[in-house]
């Protein structure tokens, strides 16, 4: 933790009763909350959205908000304000979400529907150029020949923000576990900016606000480079980041050395959380002040993990990046 932002009291009220779900602090950190939909809520939600296959959500974007409203109504309209309060709260900003009874790859479509409902209670998920949809599903196997670290199992995927190489604002990231076979390791890694002991050193550096070039590999289906600084501030002047080590392209020696030192300082932080995410659960984080990554897996010839992601913007927030939109 550093002196830039003190941790506030956790918003979880032990005496608060919610309708349709429970909420507790996680074992890893009071910043990360665990939200669990009850079995009754889960079953009623799936019954009420059964008429719409995932393809309908892909083709008719307004249905994504419709399923969100159904879920919120089942939770006595307590869910949407709770999600927004948590994700916009600098002291928290992260949720591990679970629905009782959704825990098998055979329910993959139900997982997409649930995650879509939650995401569209806080904003809208952006078009994902890698998949051509508002979400992306991808598989990690024991052998990988792709052009980024996304699917490479036997190394750490370094901490980063999403949306660094696109022009759309990326306020939130949702990462869901759809399937897992012959897996050991591979926990999600999270770092809250205010728990990074070197934040002040790098945030105050002259290069922190210099626009840098970000370019994605061919698999991302994005051909246009974007330019923005690694650091920015929110409306209250607090540090936020748009950073990924794989895609930032330093233009000279000075930038290259600084970025290398930045990467080392992030990866060696004592504030990193290691979070197991079982099948059917998903992480939902504020992408402006949480970095995320993945630990390495233990090799196995039949290793398989399938993930689903959504990333988008908050429809109810006014504090995006202040100087570089």
From Swiss-Prot:
<comment type="subunit">
    <text>Homotetramer.</text>
</comment>
<keyword id="KW-0560">Oxidoreductase</keyword>
<keyword id="KW-0223">Dioxygenase</keyword>
<feature type="binding site">
    <location>
        <position position="162"/>
    </location>
    <ligand>
        <name>Fe cation</name>
    </ligand>
</feature>
<dbReference type="GO" id="GO:0106343">
    <property type="term" value="F:glutarate dioxygenase activity"/>
</dbReference>
<feature type="binding site">
    <location>
        <position position="160"/>
    </location>
    <ligand>
        <name>Fe cation</name>
    </ligand>
</feature>
<keyword id="KW-0408">Iron</keyword>
<comment type="function">
    <text>Acts as an alpha-ketoglutarate-dependent dioxygenase catalyzing hydroxylation of glutarate (GA) to L-2-hydroxyglutarate (L2HG). Functions in a L-lysine degradation pathway that proceeds via cadaverine, glutarate and L-2-hydroxyglutarate.</text>
</comment>
<dbReference type="InterPro" id="IPR015038">
    <property type="entry name" value="GlaH"/>
</dbReference>
<dbReference type="GO" id="GO:0019477">
    <property type="term" value="P:L-lysine catabolic process"/>
</dbReference>
<protein>
    <recommendedName>
        <fullName>Glutarate 2-hydroxylase</fullName>
        <ecNumber>1.14.11.64</ecNumber>
    </recommendedName>
</protein>
<comment type="pathway">
    <text>Amino-acid degradation.</text>
</comment>
<dbReference type="Pfam" id="PF08943">
    <property type="entry name" value="CsiD"/>
</dbReference>
<keyword id="KW-0479">Metal-binding</keyword>
<comment type="similarity">
    <text>Belongs to the glutarate hydroxylase family.</text>
</comment>
<dbReference type="InterPro" id="IPR042098">
    <property type="entry name" value="TauD-like_sf"/>
</dbReference>
<dbReference type="GO" id="GO:0008198">
    <property type="term" value="F:ferrous iron binding"/>
</dbReference>
<dbReference type="GO" id="GO:0050498">
    <property type="term" value="F:oxidoreductase activity, acting on paired donors, with incorporation or reduction of molecular oxygen, with 2-oxoglutarate as one donor, and the other dehydrogenated"/>
</dbReference>
<feature type="binding site">
    <location>
        <position position="292"/>
    </location>
    <ligand>
        <name>Fe cation</name>
    </ligand>
</feature>
């Amino acid at each position: 933790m550093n002196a830039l932002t003190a941790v506030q009291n956790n918003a979880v009220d032990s005496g608060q009763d919610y309708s349709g779900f429970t909420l507790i602090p996680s074992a890893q950190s009071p910043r990360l909350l665990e939200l669990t939909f009850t079995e009754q809520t889960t079953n009623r939600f799936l019954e009420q959205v059964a008429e719409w296959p995932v393809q309908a959500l892909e083709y008719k974007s307004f249905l994504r908000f419709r399923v969100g409203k159904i879920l919120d109504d089942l939770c006595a309209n307590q869910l949407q304000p709770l999600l927004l309060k948590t994700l916009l709260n600098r002291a928290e900003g992260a949720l591990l979400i679970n629905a009782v009874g959704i825990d098998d790859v055979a329910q993959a479509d139900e997982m997409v529907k649930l995650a879509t409902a939650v995401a569209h209670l806080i904003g809208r998920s952006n078009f994902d150029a890698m998949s051509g949809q508002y979400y992306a599903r991808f598989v990690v196997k024991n052998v990988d020949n792709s052009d980024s670290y996304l699917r490479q199992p036997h190394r750490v995927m370094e901490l980063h923000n999403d949306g660094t190489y696109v022009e759309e604002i990326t306020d939130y990231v949702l990462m869901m576990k759809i399937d897992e076979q012959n897996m050991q390791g591979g926990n999600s890694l999270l770092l809250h900016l205010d728990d990074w002991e070197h934040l002040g050193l790098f945030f105050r550096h002259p290069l922190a606000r210099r626009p840098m070039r970000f370019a994605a590999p061919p698999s991302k289906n994005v051909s246009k480079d974007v330019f923005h600084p690694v650091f920015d501030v929110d409306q209250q002047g607090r540090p936020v980041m748009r950073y990924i080590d794989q895609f930032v392209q330093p233009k000279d020696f000075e930038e290259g050395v600084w970025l290398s030192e930045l990467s080392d300082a992030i990866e060696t932080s004592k504030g990193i959380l290691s979070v197991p995410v079982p099948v059917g659960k998903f992480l939902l984080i504020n992408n402006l002040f949480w970095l995320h990554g993945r630990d390495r897996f233990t090799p196995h010839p039949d290793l398989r993990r399938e993930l689903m992601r959504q990333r988008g913007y908050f429809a109810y927030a006014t504090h995006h990046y202040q100087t570089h939109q």
